[in-house]
């Protein structure tokens, strides 16, 4: 749900108009609208490059993952890891576009830790992978855009911790 929708629903539930603070939040969100669209476009267009950089970094941090018997050993397992990286990037862009973290919570965080545990995927590796995706993404963006997108990566990292 978008920031605007959430504010309206909250105000309606309480039978009131949006507060000054809520209206300011909407105004800030609308002011950054073109930036949010640009960020989502850059991440979409640079997805392969971001994943390539992040995977190189994560496998340098954890070479045991691509060693025989590792969670990303072999082309099939490795491609599944990279698929997940693309999924997380899309999830980040949904949050950026919506202006809140509800879509990340609804689509991606609930149950993900348990899923990875059941599959034998080390959580520390996924946390490191999201951090690597963040760093690779930030290389593609300016400082102002980094301030907008960073909290969404951090939210996923905290949610998986």
UniProtKB/Swiss-Prot annotation:
This protein's UniProt keywords: Antenna complex, Bile pigment, Chloroplast, Chromophore, Electron transport, Membrane, Methylation, Photosynthesis, Phycobilisome, Plastid, Thylakoid, Transport
Binding-site residues for (2R,3E)-phycocyanobilin, renumbered to this chain: 81
Organism for this UniProt entry: Porphyra purpurea (Red seaweed)
Subcellular location(s) of the protein: Plastid, Chloroplast thylakoid membrane
Family the UniProt entry places it in: Belongs to the phycobiliprotein family.
SUPFAM superfamilies associated with the record: Globin-like
GO biological process annotation, one example: photosynthesis
Keyword tRNA-binding: no
Membrane topology recorded in Swiss-Prot or TrEMBL: Peripheral membrane protein
Annotated function: Allophycocyanin is a photosynthetic bile pigment-protein complex with maximum absorption at approximately 650 nanometers.
InterPro entries for the chain: Globin-like_sf, Phycobilisome_asu/bsu, Phycobilisome_asu/bsu_sf
Lineage, top ranks: Eukaryota, Rhodophyta, Bangiophyceae, Bangiales, Bangiaceae
Pfam families: Phycobilisome (PF00502)
Main localization of the protein described in the UniProt heading: plastid
PTM summary: Contains one covalently linked bilin chromophore.
One term under GO cellular component: phycobilisome
Protein name: Allophycocyanin alpha-B chain
Positions carrying N4-methylasparagine: 71
């Amino acid at each position: 749900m978008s920031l605007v929708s959430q504010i309206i629903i909250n105000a309606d539930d309480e039978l009131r108009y949006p507060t000054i603070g809520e209206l300011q939040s909407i105004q800030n969100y609308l002011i950054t609208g073109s930036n949010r669209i640009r960020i989502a476009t850059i991440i979409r267009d640079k997805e392969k490059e971001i994943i390539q950089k992040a995977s190189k970094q994560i496998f340098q941090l954890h070479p045991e993952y691509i060693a025989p018997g590792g969670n990303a050993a072999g082309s099939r397992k490795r491609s599944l890891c990279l698929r997940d990286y693309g999924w997380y990037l899309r999830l980040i862009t949904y949050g950026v576009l919506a202006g809140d973290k509800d879509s990340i919570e609804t689509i991606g965080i609930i149950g993900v830790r348990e899923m990875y545990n059941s599959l034998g995927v080390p959580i520390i590796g996924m946390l490191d992978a999201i951090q690597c995706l963040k760093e690779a993404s930030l290389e593609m963006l300016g400082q102002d855009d980094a301030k907008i997108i960073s909290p969404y990566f951090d939210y996923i990292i905290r949610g998986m911790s």
